[in-house]
Curated annotation (Swiss-Prot):
UniProt biased composition (Polar residues): 116-141, 148-169
Subcellular location(s) per record: Host cell junction, Host plasmodesma; Host Golgi apparatus
UniProt modified residues of type Phosphoserine: S64, S133
Lineage: Viruses, Riboviria, Orthornavirae, Pisuviricota, Pisoniviricetes
Species annotation: Turnip yellows virus (isolate FL-1) (TuYV)
Pfam families: Luteo_Vpg
The protein's name: Movement protein
Amino acid sequence: MEEDDHAGKHDALSALSQWLWSKPLGQHNADLDDDEEVTTGQEELFLPEEQVRARHLFSQKTISREVPAEQSRSGRVYQTARHSLMECSRPTMSIKSQWSFWSSSPKPLPKIPVPSLTSWTHTVNSTPFPQLSTSSGSQSPGKGRLQRLTSTERNGTTLPRTNSGSSTKAMVLHR
């Protein structure tokens, strides 16, 4: 059910976004007082010393249109659709982040800066990864630095443990 709800919201967002983007750029009707602004961009980053490649694709379209007073006290509606895709990879990992945003308001929408690829990759690069070691000097999970994650169902309840021939463990580093 939760997946259906998510899919329904995604479909609705997609339909609204397509509607917002359906008006071609530069097609203005002299009878209408519509304003639109479009921002698109692509950023790429390569850090050879860290073997990191990153890419960010984004687009944003904002439209301000005149509407009947019964639809908006201001007589205008402001709509924005934003899409972003970020990818970062290095030999030992690959991260992909994608999101879409749509808003509609009778008031002017605040200018939201586009996420910066360099700040995103800085976060990825500065995250220390625990090194696995078998030496006697390594810190054991019993000392509180590592904690086992428990498996949970969608509703948040902990799954019962079972004896089986295989197991999966997830560890989190606490600072």
